[in-house]
Amino acid sequence: MPRPPRSWVCACLEGPFISRAEKGAQYEPGIRLPDPSEMEELAEAGRGWVRIVDYAPEEDVEARFLATVVRLGILACLGHTAATYEQAMRAIDGGARHATHLFNAMSPLEHRAPGVAGAMLTDRRATVEIIADGIHIHPAIARLVIAARGFRDVALITDAVAPAGLPEGDYEFVGRKITVCCGAIRLASGSLAGSMLTLDGAVRNIVTFTGIGWSEAISMATHVPATIAGVALRKGRIAPGADADLVALDDHGFVQRTWVHGHLAYQGAPGKDS
């Protein structure tokens, strides 16, 4: 089978301009304050590929970093942040338009302190994404997100890391010990370190968790993220002029075949779920 052409969409920087308090599994020595000059250097080095960047707005006190990101035409995302609701709303007012893995590595939703999650659930100027594995968020939270925002503003992501798909056991990842167990990947501290989720699994889960239809769930994994990344004219849809990146699912939502730019890239065993 000929090797299919690569189909990169963009580069997303999930660091280093994040909060140490909400670093999750990120490498703490690499975390830095949001720096407009460094962001400009990264954008230049990326030669147009850097289109999404996470940052902690509470660390960008004068909002100079956000202004730089917006001026560069890069999508500013609230992620790995301990921002208050008010700080999150000021960031949205300033041009931030997305939240990375909603509810994870961010200030929580509380009835007197809505946090970043509260801001993103109630302000339709911004889009959100969720890790629908039933571990990063409870199925009831998935239902809450869909009820508040609807499927058109919510992207499904995996947050999968290199050990995803490996048997249960201990591994080394980016110089740290991690454990794969019970469908999760954790650091020695017990903190989640990415997921074992596949995107077809996310689609199946969101249908089960929320009761939405297959077409809506598939849109959350295709058209919605393509729109967020600014590539919806050629990705995330089947239409003349769009890239022929296709996935064939069986009746249960498991991947059977994939095509990249029209080239068959994967074929599962006949009659078996992948």
Task: Name each region found by the language model.
Residues 109, 167, 173, 253, ...:
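Short, function-defining helix-loop hinge/capping sites that tune catalysis or transport
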Residues 1-49:
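Divalent-metal coordination cores built from histidine and acidic residues
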Residues 40-168, 265:
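Active-site core of metal-dependent hydrolases
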Residues 118-129, 134, 146-158, 163-249:
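His/Asp/Glu-enriched, well-ordered alpha-helical/loop segment
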Residues 227, 237-274:
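C-terminal cap of metal-dependent C-N hydrolases
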Residues 6, 48, 94, 152, ...:
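Structured loop/turn residues at beta-strand edges in well-structured enzyme cores
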